[in-house]
Amino acid sequence: MAGTSGLLNAVKPKIQTIDIQAAAGWGIAAAAGAIWVVQPFGWIKKTFIDPPPTEEK
């Protein structure tokens, strides 16, 4: 079974740097697309930027 070694290398190649870069790029694209679809800018502004309302008694 000398041919099985070559077959396994074709099925399970080593992970290359470009594969990691491509996965990161697709992740960024997916996150940007999700933010574009949801557009939570009002919630982000209300939650993180505007000061909390003060209670006056």
UniProtKB/Swiss-Prot annotation:
Protein's membrane topology: Single-pass membrane protein
Protein location: Mitochondrion inner membrane
UniProt keyword terms in alphabetical order: Membrane, Mitochondrion, Mitochondrion inner membrane, Transmembrane, Transmembrane helix
Superkingdom of the source species: Eukaryota
Positions in coiled-coil regions: none
Residues in the Mitochondrial intermembrane compartment per record: 45-57
Side Mitochondrial matrix, residues: 1-23
Gene Ontology CC terms, in alphabetical order: cytosol; mitochondrial inner membrane; mitochondrion
Residue spans crossing the bilayer: 24-44
Subunit structure: Component of the ubiquinol-cytochrome c oxidoreductase (cytochrome b-c1 complex, complex III, CIII), a multisubunit enzyme composed of 10 subunits. The complex is composed of 3 respiratory subunits cytochrome b (MT-CYB), cytochrome c1 (CYC1-1 or CYC1-2) and Rieske protein (UCR1-1 or UCR1-2), 2 core protein subunits MPPalpha1 (or MPPalpha2) and MPPB, and 5 low-molecular weight protein subunits QCR7-1 (or QCR7-2), UCRQ-1 (or UCRQ-2), QCR9, UCRY and probably QCR6-1 (or QCR6-2).
Family: Belongs to the UQCR11/QCR10 family.
Annotated function: Component of the ubiquinol-cytochrome c oxidoreductase, a multisubunit transmembrane complex that is part of the mitochondrial electron transport chain which drives oxidative phosphorylation.
Protein name: Cytochrome b-c1 complex subunit 10, mitochondrial
Origin species: Arabidopsis thaliana (Mouse-ear cress)
Phylogenetic placement of the source organism: Eukaryota, Viridiplantae, Streptophyta, Embryophyta, Tracheophyta
